Regions:
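Sequence context of c-type cytochrome heme-c attachment sites
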Residues: 20-106, 111, 117-150, 172-194
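Cleavable N-terminal signal peptides
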Residues: 10-12, 21-22
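Short, functional "switch" segments adjacent to catalytic/cofactor/reactive centers
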Residues: 153
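Bacterial N-terminal signal peptides that target proteins for export
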Residues: 1-11
Length: 194
């Protein structure tokens, strides 16, 4: 080895490159979750959450878009003010991006409610296996400390109650145009909906 420092630098660079990519990819997508949660994935497939990104495409949900004063022929799949409520992890590390869209994140999937799965999935799986085999439960704190989110009401409100004049204190721009004033079906009450 004529240049050990060069080799060391190259090795450290490769390590930094690959470990950085792994750390950035914290959202895994619904395919990872559905490998164990088959019945949940099957029932989710037919929901509006599963088709959330589809609703942003031109020509879809025309009547709703017209009521909300949106152009029904516009492609909103590239609109950063809209996409965030239609995908997993938009604007967050490892989440959906318009520039490098990942299909498993292109819907309101598991990680929209439960948080990015990479850091807690292993402990979540072990807890499930322990429950299935021995009937033992795992403290919620174990997976919460690894990033599994249990603030479901907040997660729902971030999109369903994010409009001007909302009773939710966390409402902020960009606001959803789909409000109860546009159509009563957009009235959201967490306790009744979930």
């Amino acid at each position: 080895m004529k240049h050990p420092i060069t080799y060391l630098f190259a090795a450290l660079s490769m390590f930094a490159l690959f470990s950085g990519a792994a750390l950035a990819d914290t959202y895994e997508g619904r395919t990872k979750c559905s490998s164990c949660h088959k019945s949940q994935a099957k029932s989710w497939k037919d929901t509006a959450h599963a088709k959330a990104m589809e609703s942003l495409k031109p020509g879809t949900r025309k009547e709703a878009k017209v009521k909300a004063k949106l152009d029904p022929e516009k492609d909103y799949t590239q609109d950063k003010d809209c996409v965030g409520c239609h995908v997993d992890g938009f604007g967050k590390k490892g989440g959906y991006t318009i520039e490098a869209a990942k299909k498993p994140l292109a819907a309101v999937g598991c990680e929209s409610c439960h948080g990015p799965g990479k850091n807690y999935r292993g402990d979540h799986r072990k807890a499930g296996q322990a429950f299935e085999s021995k009937g033992t439960t795992t403290q919620r704190k174990v997976v919460a400390d690894k990033g599994q989110d249990f603030k479901f009401e907040e997660a729902c409100a971030a999109c369903h109650l994010n409009y001007e004049g909302s009773p939710w204190k966390g409402a902020k721009a960009p606001y959803t145009p789909f409000t109860p004033a546009v159509d009563p079906k957009y009235t959201f009450d967490f306790d009744k909906m979930v």
